[in-house]
Amino acid sequence: MSRPRRRGRDINGVLLLDKPQGMSSNDALQKVKRIYNANRAGHTGALDPLATGMLPICLGEATKFSQYLLDSDKRYRVIARLGQRTDTSDADGQIVEERPVTFSAEQLAAALDTFRGDIEQIPSMYSALKYQGKKLYEYARQGIEVPREARPITVYELLFIRHEGNELELEIHCSKGTYIRTIIDDLGEKLGCGAHVIYLRRLAVSKYPVERMVTLEHLRELVEQAEQQDIPAAELLDPLLMPMDSPASDYPVVNLPLTSSVYFKNGNPVRTSGAPLEGLVRVTEGENGKFIGMGEIDDEGRVAPRRLVVEYPA
């Protein structure tokens, strides 16, 4: 039986999209997938429609390694409206409570300090976490509140930017699983006035260079430019991509000789010199260091395959 024809291009890499405000992360993903005519695409950590900023879009084989970005730290710029609390903790929700803003600068500094370091956070009902197989926001839209357990997060840095009138601006560098809306809602309660997010921008994900972010508008301009020059759009679009193994850039590299990489790519653990004693590794082959997948050091010190790059015939 012949293999079913794959739709789209076998293009592999990560695009650092600057997501526009008012668009869901999935809508942004689908637009990028169509522009690149990619056979597969996935994003790593959704941004709310209200939010803008860095949304890594993994194309092709890079989708296999997107999970490593989900575990990475992130940096945000947020502006909160003080004195108003909403049901979603952001400006897209309904105002449920209004209170005067009466705290002092000293009280603000003390409240902010309670959110630095290792803390416990109860996720918002308006989140994509699941309870009994159903997303929390689906319960919330039905007016149902379900129990949520506090989860450990780390706020590595919380910078005070400004406080003018009923607006408070902060910059937050945090671990995976941190909900900025929840931090703002909890901060508003500590200050006794309530608060919600009116502006949120993701400044950075992991160690990705901010200057490599691109907008949907720029991608469309490149497609038009390619048409005018009568060249394939891929010639202008593909250089924007980060390497497919960039989501796992924090892991050490093990380079296999071609004689060993054949066995590794067939699913077999292999021995090699220079491997760490334990943990996950990025595996490359040959003198050019071509990335072939992720491995893990097994109990016998061998590099065992965990996720492999598949090369499809043209």
UniProtKB/Swiss-Prot annotation:
Which key words are in the record? Isomerase, tRNA processing
User: Which cellular component terms (GO) are annotated to the entry?
Assistant: cytosol
Q: Which reaction does it catalyse?
A: uridine(55) in tRNA = pseudouridine(55) in tRNA
What residues make up the catalytic site? D48
Q: Where is this region: RNA binding?
A: 124-152
* SUPFAM superfamilies xrefs: Pseudouridine synthase (SSF55120), PUA domain-like (SSF88697)
Mutation: K19 to M/R; reported impact is: Reduced structural stability and decrease in activity
Enzyme Commission number, as recorded: 5.4.99.25
Q: What is the effect of changing H43A?
A: 330-fold decrease in catalytic efficiency
Record GO biological process: mRNA pseudouridine synthesis; tRNA folding; tRNA modification; tRNA pseudouridine synthesis
What result follows from mutating C58A? Answer: Slight increase in activity. Slight increase in activity
Please give one Gene Ontology molecular function term for this protein.
pseudouridine synthase activity
Q: What conditions trigger expression of this protein?
A: Weakly expressed in maxicells, part of the metY operon that extends to pnp.
UniProt: substrate binding residues? H43, Y76, Y179, R202
Q: Changing H43F does what? A: 2-fold decrease in catalytic efficiency
**Matching NCBIfam families, A to Z?**
TruB (TIGR00431)
Q: What does this protein do?
A: Responsible for synthesis of pseudouridine from uracil-55 in the psi GC loop of transfer RNAs.
Q: By what name is this protein known?
A: tRNA pseudouridine synthase B
